[in-house]
Structures are given as structure tokens and as C-alpha cells.
Amino acid sequence: MSFDLFAYRELKDIVGDCEDRYDQIEHTVLNPKIQDICREKQSPEFVSKLDGFVLRLEDELMNFRDVEYRGCTLSEKEIIDLFYFKFLDVPLLSRMHSVAEYFIDQVETLRDRDLSDEEREEVMECFRSMYETRDCYVLYSRFLEKEGYRPLPHCQIEKRRLRYEDVYPVLYLKYTLYQCRNHHGIKHVVVDEMQDYSW
């Protein structure tokens, strides 16, 4: 499996399609200025800006409020403490899931029974709704706009198509913001000397 195919599989829940390296080569032949933008988006400076953007999201993305479910309440202050202190090691867009699990454990203990899947989902949705958005495509588009680049087009997931120079920054953003699954199926990584994945 190529790294481009790996990236496509990892991003299929965010975008409908991703360009591959051959698409980028074709674009740069037709418009050499694209090569400069590609180099910029693959630079350490661009990654540093993306990291700074992620840090600012900790405050900008959240809309905390009390949660009440069947007589059990978790106050806004308690949620903030859990979010910023107890579960700080959990990536930002997965962190509220940990807070919700904590609350669900409290509810189950007080009610002396497990919540059904539907009840758990209802509680999870209360906590997920505290994020302004959880969509990496939207967040990356916002980042591009703040940095002076053209934002990504607003469209439904199936119609989204990432240019090659944006595929790896979005993948990086996803792995930074979400608790991603392990890839136990990957046993070896072979880097062809013709492919340069370094900065």
C-alpha cells in the first residue's frame, strides 16, 4: 500500500476524494506557481503554524455548559476541570468523549444499572455538541484562511476533494486532534529513495 493510499483511507470520513502525487505533478506542469505553494505547505514553518492553530482551538472551539441527565448533573465548572486538567493528555476532539464516559460512569453508579446504547448515545451527543465543529476539513479551511491562503470550498463530504498539497496537513491535523486507531496491520514501512517524505 502506498502512503497516498494510506492517507486516502484515513481521510475517507472527512473528504470524498484526495489527489495523489501524479495529479500534483500534472498541475505543476500546467502551472509552475503551484510548486511554491506545495513547498510552503510541506515546510516545518507551516507545521509550526498548524500547531499554533491547534493550541488556539483549545479555547476557540469549546462552548461549555452544564449537563443534566435523569437527575444527575455535571456543572460547567466540573466539565472545564475535567476537560483541561484530568483529560489533558487526550487529543482535543476526543477529549469530550472521555468527559462523557466519566459522567456516564457517575450516572450508572447512581442509578445502579448500565445505560442502554441509546441512552449512552444521547449523553454523548450532549457532550459532543459543546464543540463548535469536529470537522477537520472545516478547521483546516479556517486555518488556511487565517494564514492568507484560499480556503477550501464549502460542500458536502462526498463532494470534497483535497489537493495533494493539502492531504498531508489534513492528515496531520486529524492525528493531532483525534485519538486515532492503531495500525497493527502495518508490519513494515519501506521508503523508496525516489519519494522524499522529509522536510
Language model regions located:
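Alpha-helical nucleic-acid-binding subdomain
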Residues: 1-198
